[in-house]
Amino acid sequence: MDLTPATALPKLLAAAWLLPLASFVVILFVGKRLGPHGKWAGYLAVGAIVSAFLLSCVAMFAVWLPNHELPVAHHGEHHEEGDHHDDAPADDDHTHGTAALLHESPQTAQADRESPFQLAAFQEDAAHADEHAAEAGHAANPPPTYYFGDWYSLGEFGRLKLTIGYYIDALTVTMFCMVTLIASCVHIYALGYMHDELHDPYHDHEVIVHGHHLHRPGRFHRFFQYLSLFCFSMLGIVIAGNVAMVFVFWELVGICSYFLIGFYFERHSASTAANKAFIVNRVGDFGMLIGMMALWASLGTFAFGDKQDAKGQTVLTESGAIAEPGIFSQLRTAENGFRLVPPASMIAEETRQQPAIEAEDAAAGKAGHWLLLIAGVGIFCGCVGKSAQFPLHVWLPDAMEGPTPVSALVHSATMVAAGVYLVGRFYPAFCPEALLVIAIIGCITLSLAATIAITATDIKRVLAYSTVSQLGYMMLALGLGGWIAGLFHLITHAFFKSLLFMCSGSVIHAVHTNDMTEMGGLRKKMPITAYTMLIGCLAIIGAGVPLTPIGFSGYFSKDSIIEQAWSHAQTNGGGYWAFLAMAVIGASMTAFYMFRLWFMTFTGAPRDHHKYDHAHESPRVMTGPLVLLAIFAIAVAWPAFRLTGLLEQAQPVGTAAGGSGVLIEDLVVPAEHLSHAPDIKLRAGLAAFSSALIGVFGAAVVYLWGYLNPSEIKQTFKPIYTLLWNKWYFDQLYNILFVRPALFIGRQIAAFDRGVIDWFLHACAWFCRLISSVFAFVFDGALVDGTVNALARWTWDFGLLLRRFQTGSLRQYVLFIVMGTWFMCLAYFAAAFVLMS
């Protein structure tokens, strides 16, 4: 078998991607016939996703790692090593695109010929960025190793090429392993959790029909059918080689989430939640379309990478230029030191030909950056919807109406992860001003969701708001220049958040309630669930020993985010310290609400003895995945596993050295390696540890030791509690601002339809009926029917006349024969006489 990366990786990952699709198709057509009540459909789906995971592991450990030497990592080891080391040089055989980018691109040549003011602006901006890079001690990184190609061409429409292709780098392979591993655990877990769906009929105790609980056929096979399609869609986003392909699978993920969130569609709450998720995400997708069109109209391509040959080498023209440059290489060329510089194609021809009053007014640096900002914010709008960021965060908590395995997958490895992943993938196209927007949205989201989680009593909703908050952390890190930190936390979060959701499902499966106020003392009844969930809680708060490489996975990734926030604030000063403050405060709130959840659920006296007496540990098919995920929640980020080395290997072109704003001139995005300075690590590590400790201590004081009464705290801070209990009134606000006006407009349109359009149509119908009545009476009735009826009447009368001769008398018939013969003879002789004469 050919294990060269350019050949093997597309085949292995394509097979891993298509296996869930094959499972979906088989279950779609024969799911009900796969065993009793479709039981074997679950095993088929599990086999498909586990096989996809194994293929992903082969791609990682047998192909990628042996052929691509990992650089010296700085995230993870930075808890142990104080000095900074430069990145290890990339393998010469796999540094695709670097040599090609050293040649002058057609876009740059055109800019040099047509706009000297643009060149002056580029050089001035380059000097600014190079000065900052020199301070950082780090040069802009060249393009990472990647493999790009097309499997199938759907067509060409002018400049637009629509293809099904791939873009494979270290991030792609890492995401494949993470998504398929967590999805495998969720699939196996669902075999036990969804076992009741094998009963026929299934009794839904939350739906009353005619005074009785709803009885319906089980939908076990349909659940795994949707789950397989969901995984296929997410993997399609990860492997996609162009923006159009990303958007197709982006929408397919939305459709799958609609099916899974509304799985119990007979429940009004579930169908409403599915509609809400679908509609809110379409709002973000509208912005994403604007960003996509802005990029395509100005760059003329949807492709991420440059065209490559069968060996994975960039295809060049005879002049040495890139034959078909992708988005990233057009925006970050070697001539500009791989910095983000809008190409001449981003400025309209007529704008470039206008005489400039000042150089900066005609420079592509300003006008092009505005277009880059629009494109970047547009793409980010889609990510805001998918990753439930403010102000489109309202759908994710309601998504808890779906089965718990769905929640575990949605909140960890698939839907919400897609938004953060896409920000990371498009990172080379984001200008510093767009990154600032991302950081602001992430900061608001992490603090807003954390405050709501403090008051929630539904165990799954606490975790849902926790997800929103943690996604805000990731967006904050990406917006502040921490590309590795943000995606590092995405991967670690996927493991401990899927663990936490599956533990909550285990609890719900045992006590048949989501309300934590009806739980308590379950540690004795459910020890495996309790302690694996404790591991998840410790991981999400970033528990670890400060300044040492000893800790849970969240310790490494969350500390990286706080360190980057500290570096950014230290570089920019002023109001930028607010990002750091909210990151630290958010860490404290995270520790508080997570241990509040654990204490209320597993410690103390039972609050509902009936539920406590019937509680039991979940079967092994459910606890097995919990133990496996707990191991990864502890160790996946340990320096020995070099996860950050993989991420550094995939770091987007030109982003390692940071950058500086053009529209906001005093904005500086610091190089990420600066956050590893010993003084920043010390202060950020102590701040993160102290904030988490304060949160855990606060939760213990109230919910473990009982020194403070929660009811008294609610009464003391009743206005604040009411605000948080009602989720900052966002649902009510959106109801007033959008839902009610939309319904009002709908009612007015309906009234106009009934009162004007329907009246006009009815009038037209009445007029047509009148005309048809006249025609029916005059033309049809008198002429057509009259003629036909007259002929019929004449025929009838003639028949009556002939009837008189039919008397039945034999003598009369003989007489008629004789007379007829006589007339015939007479006629014959008369004719002969005429002819002879």
Segments the model singles out, each with a brief description of its role:
Residues 1-14, 33-221, 225, 301, ...:
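Transmembrane helix-loop-helix hairpins at membrane boundaries of multipass inner-membrane proteins
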Residues 2-19, 37-47, 160-179, 219-226, ...:
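Membrane-entry segments of alpha-helical transmembrane domains in multi-pass membrane proteins
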Residues 125-170, 643-690, 701-837:
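Aromatic-capped, Gly/Pro-kinked transmembrane alpha-helices
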Residues 56, 183-187, 497, 588-597, ...:
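Hydrophobic alpha-helical membrane-embedded segments
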Residues 1-10, 67-76, 137-165, 236-246, ...:
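Membrane-interface interhelical loops and short amphipathic "cap" helices
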Residues 17-32, 384, 388:
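N-terminal signal-anchor/start-transfer transmembrane helix
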Residues 185-246, 255-617, 632-640:
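Hydrophobic transmembrane alpha-helices and their helix-loop junctions in integral membrane proteins
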Residues 19, 416, 442, 536-538, ...:
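Hydrophobic membrane-spanning alpha-helices of multi-pass integral membrane proteins
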